[in-house]
Amino acid sequence: MQPALASQGVKGSVTNALSAAFLGSLGGGKSFANNLLVYYAVLYGARALIVDPKAERGNWKRDFPEIADEINIVNLTSDERNRGMLDPYVIMRRPKDAESLAIDILTFLTGISSRDGNHFPILRRAVRTVTNSKRRGLFCVIEELRKEGSPLAVSIADHIESFTDYDFAHLLFSDGNIKKSISLEKQLNIIQVADLVLPDKGTSFEEFTTMELLSVAMLIVISTFALDFIHTDRSVFKIVDLDEAWSFLNVAQGKTLANKLVRAGRAMNAAVYFVTQNAADLADESLKNNIGLKFAFRSTDIVEIKKTLEFFGLDPEDEGNQKRLRNLENGQCLMQDLYGHVGVVQFHPVFADFLHGFDTKPPMKAGVAV
């Protein structure tokens, strides 16, 4: 398989979209297949950035010594040394991009809409002032709001500051004095954030807890940071791999970001791999039309089966199609290639190292019979 081929205008292809979707419930082989394709792409010269919210790839340097020198694992914990590392003003290279992301994150956390004529202009003005200052950080936005002094500005400052009480939130807020930033110089870069609390799949945005809001906000920051990665050397094929993508595809800012990543990827020889549970997560028409390769693993839910078949452009009411998806074995998936062909594909580990290195099952205690 050549994941970079779609953009080359190959005769007979029905898509030039580089991005891919990996769909399926837990335990069907979705993560294994995704990891294997990324690994081989890197082995053959691609560069990759994996957003790993469940921190399942921390073992890769140990388990894959042949490429260990080209693996960069960034593990962001709530330790003091990581303070502010995910602040938009720290993580983004261009001040304008940092400003845009700061607005997105602060409106996401506070629920202030751009259509709110009372609160939004005050927040926008404070962010712009910080962007034009020498000292930039989200804590500086709080300071700027307090300087303005109006009851509304102070209320917004109090609201934002209430999020900083969580140790976990220290990653998002800097005082403008942070100098170090995340480096993506290696061929295979993995960003992990410890203690993320992702909302359950069916949880609506209005029901998010504070920890869930902060967790999704951090994923949005990291995924936006991926834009900088995409805009590197156009001659090198790149992959941005978004594990648990459903967690931010379910919020407006996340959907906008996903479309932005895919569009930038098309122009910059980069693929975005969405690893998610349901086809409905990628139902947005503009996003769906920019996904070339599709992989669907076993599902037993008839509603989900029909949505997946529809996503593949197949008849969702055809019982043969439904049965095929329902009866897939572990490691098997329904795949659609760049020529529009659909068929069942089996992913074989070939080497035991892959089976062990990509294993996401929790370890069992010694002596426990299986």
Annotated model-derived regions:
Residues 95-136, 283-370:
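P-loop NTPase motor core of the ASCE superfamily
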Residues 45-49, 70-74, 187-188, 237-239, ...:
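Beta-sheet entry/capping signal
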Residues 62-66, 84-263, 267-270, 324-339:
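P-loop NTPase motor domains
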Residues 1-3:
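Pre-Walker A segment
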Residues 27-87:
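Walker A/P-loop NTP-binding active-site region of P-loop NTPases
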Residues 52, 72-81, 272-274, 319-329:
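A generic structural motif
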Residues 5-28, 33-38, 51-55, 201-322, ...:
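Conserved P-loop NTPase motor cores
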Residues 76, 198, 298:
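Metal-dependent catalytic core segments for phosphate chemistry
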